[in-house]
Design a protein with these regions (language model features):
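Conserved residues at beta->alpha junctions
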Residues: 222
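Active-site-proximal cap/lid insertion segments
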Residues: 1-140, 153-156, 160-161, 214, ...
Length: 242
């Protein structure tokens, strides 16, 4: 979260680092969930705009990286305390971010969109005797799944009202295919599958992005009406059951 403030020692390694260019930094055309990065601008006392100021954008991204490094070091301190207390082998650790963050992608500096950068959040789960420690998975899951996962890992019955599903199968088999994820913000709703993201708007406008081709840079809704209709049905079905 803003502001991006980390102790200086975590920023120093990035001082002369070469930062990769921002992918698809252009403002998207047509009706989208794009916004003017108002939350970021409220903290911007330098009165510079990272959208058209490359040096400032690079500096902001370095400070973001420093915050990630700071968070990593803080987690290390927590793990050290668990080890010193002798309870690390009886503890489930979950690191989870409640949202992602645009660092200039789609000309947005912040969250509050229905694009991948805002909705894809970090999730790390570790527990004693985990089958494949350190193995990443690309499976699509939802934050609803965290609670039933903790219930299963701690041998607690999952309440009937819980809508999520345990992630234990993905922890045991990281290559396992995920399901779908839905989200909404304001008057927009979205569903994400392995290949597509569909975004619908209250005024009827539709966005469809193909992650096997252009990612979320080209709206292909007009070219794939059958896909739009199928995903619209799946989206509404999920939301109606929520």
């Amino acid at each position: 979260h803003l502001p991006f403030g980390a102790p200086a020692k975590y920023l120093r390694p990035y001082a002369n680092a070469k930062v990769p260019e921002i992918p698809h930094p252009q403002k998207p055309t047509g009706k989208t969930t794009w916004h003017g990065s108002g939350e970021f601008m409220k903290y911007n006392r330098w009165e510079r705009n990272p959208i058209d100021d490359h040096d400032f954008a690079t500096n902001v991204r370095k400070h973001y990286a420093a915050c990630v490094t700071y968070a990593d070091a803080s987690v290390g301190r927590i793990i050290k305390v668990l080890q010193e207390a002798g309870i690390e082998k009886n503890t489930v650790i979950v690191l989870w971010g409640d949202h992602g963050w645009h660092l200039g992608e789609h000309a947005v500096w912040g969250k509050h969109t229905l694009f991948e950068e805002s909705l894809r959040s970090p999730l790390i789960i570790s527990y004693p005797k985990i089958e494949m420690p350190g193995k990443a998975t690309e499976a699509i899951v939802e934050t609803l799944d965290i609670f039933p996962t903790l219930c299963e890992l701690t041998n607690i019955s999952v309440p009937e009202f819980v809508q999520g599903k345990s992630l234990r199968p993905f922890l045991q088999e990281p290559e396992r295919r995920g399901d779908t994820a839905v989200a909404y913000s304001g008057k927009g709703q979205t569903i994400r599958t392995d290949q597509y993201r569909l975004i619908t708007h209250a005024n009827g406008h539709v966005e469809l992005y193909d992650h096997e081709n252009q990612g979320e840079t080209e709206n292909v809704a007009d070219a794939y009406p059958k896909v739009v209709q199928e995903l619209r049905v799946r989206l509404h079905d999920r939301l109606d059951r929520s």
